[in-house]
Amino acid sequence: MAAAAAALAATEPPPAMPQAAGAGGPAARRDFYWLRSFLAGGIAGCCAKTTVAPLDRVKVLLQAHNHHYRHLGVFSTLRAVPKKEGYLGLYKGNGAMMIRIFPYGAIQFMAFEHYKTLITTKLGVSGHVHRLMAGSMAGMTAVICTYPLDMVRVRLAFQVKGEHTYTGIIHAFKTIYAKEGGFLGFYRGLMPTILGMAPYAGVSFFTFGTLKSVGLSYAPTLLGRPSSDNPNVLVLKTHINLLCGGVAGAIAQTISYPFDVTRRRMQLGAVLPEFEKCLTMRETMKYVYGHHGIRKGLYRGLSLNYIRCVPSQAVAFTTYELMKQFFHLN
């Protein structure tokens, strides 16, 4: 993380020169640039995850084969959860999700912009490749910084009404720390998460950025419009942003999904009866493949992930593009 922080610091815009009140220009745009970029990414992440929170809960239940819902499909589970736990059951774990997703989204989008600049200026890598590299690095940075919050969120989402191991976020933190190896207990499943996040974030940012670049290059009038904060910059129209974000999410999710399944099982740890057979990433993937195969194991719940990932990424990229204009980041 120190290396990541140093890399980000290397591309921080220089301090703005004092200007008269109300003055615009490049210097004014650099005022609190990091804070504005951080807020834009955080808001984008929260909007995206709130949109698909019920689907996230169902995904966790299906991936880990919760015994109450193991024989049900995606839509059957969506109907069964409210009957058993009430409609708020679809949002179980969402409080922890919001606490995690704001810094996650903020760090990821902010890091992407800075890594992209760093890779281009310091390494001389340009074209579309720098988006792939910057996206992968940004995703890994965000994961490492916020992983303990995701661990707690998954534990809370896996609980079923009447069978609570944890009473809330703070209790979950205390219990995991006390019973699962202290601080390291919060990082179970980190390796498959990083291995899954690198291609996911990389492909996601690469696909969206490439579609945006190609679209604005070949059909600027049809697909684009001037940015509200900087008329000299073309941005995609909102509905085109949504489409490009959805396509990017679908492609990225297909590539990285087996790592996501592995991560969830490792995060749940002692909550699962087969805990001792899933201590490492290799053991977990071997267990899931051996007992459930590819379609019902490593790719179980993928249909749900398409349903949740496409709108989630569409909303995330679109909201971020709008926030960039609102916070004068273009």
Curated annotation (Swiss-Prot):
A Gene Ontology biological process term: mitochondrial coenzyme A transmembrane transport
Membrane topology term: Multi-pass membrane protein
Transmembrane in keyword set: yes
Cellular compartment(s): Mitochondrion inner membrane
Segments passing through the bilayer: 33-52, 95-112, 132-149, 189-209, 242-262, 297-317
Gene Ontology MF: a single term: coenzyme A transmembrane transporter activity
Solcar repeat extents: 32-118, 126-214, 236-326
UniProt keyword annotations, A-Z: Membrane, Mitochondrion, Mitochondrion inner membrane, Repeat, Transmembrane, Transmembrane helix, Transport
Protein family according to the UniProt entry: Belongs to the mitochondrial carrier (TC 2.A.29) family.
UniProt protein name: Solute carrier family 25 member 16
